[in-house]
């Protein structure tokens, strides 16, 4: 069976970092993930997915990723249930994340649009063709000579 999840979205709040009685770090947060299609109003909807992360990755996430951070998460879906204080069974579906990746630069995360440092622009000209040329020969075998094989040489 395969249970793999890959999500890219923005954190809706700072991760809540807690520790178990055996001193294992656990972080919980919600990730807003845009849907690939738009609603009838032309607006893009989002799913809000609960995520749990454990151990060192949880501490790293709590230290680096903040509300609004664009992150990528890999992990698995997990369901669990518990009885609440009213005695009702509550079912929870969440992503147990194994890894995360920050997907924006630090300056974008911190909201710097200007800043004290400005790159020098005098005497700078952008290359005219900055897009790599990935074009290929239409016929990769066009430059070769045909093989001279008789029907008697073929095994079938």
Swiss-Prot record:
Domain of life of the native organism: Bacteria
Motif segment (Important for interaction with partner proteins): 151-156
Pfam family of the protein (one): SSB
Ranges where the record places region Disordered: 111-156
Keywords: DNA damage, DNA recombination, DNA repair, DNA replication, DNA-binding
Domain SSB: 1-104
Single GO term (MF): single-stranded DNA binding
PROSITE patterns per the UniProt record, alphabetical: SSB
SUPFAM superfamilies attached to this UniProt entry: Nucleic acid-binding proteins (SSF50249)
CDD domains, A to Z: SSB_OBF
Gene Ontology CC entries for this record: nucleoid
Gene3D superfamilies: Nucleic acid-binding proteins
GO BP field: DNA recombination; DNA repair; DNA replication
Biased composition (Polar residues): 120-132
Subunit structure: Homotetramer.
NCBIfam families to which the protein is assigned, alphabetical: PRK07275.1, ssb
Function: Plays an important role in DNA replication, recombination and repair. Binds to ssDNA and to an array of partner proteins to recruit them to their sites of action during DNA metabolism.
Name the record gives this protein: Single-stranded DNA-binding protein
Source organism (scientific name): Streptococcus pneumoniae (strain ATCC BAA-255 / R6)
Gene that encodes the chain: ssb
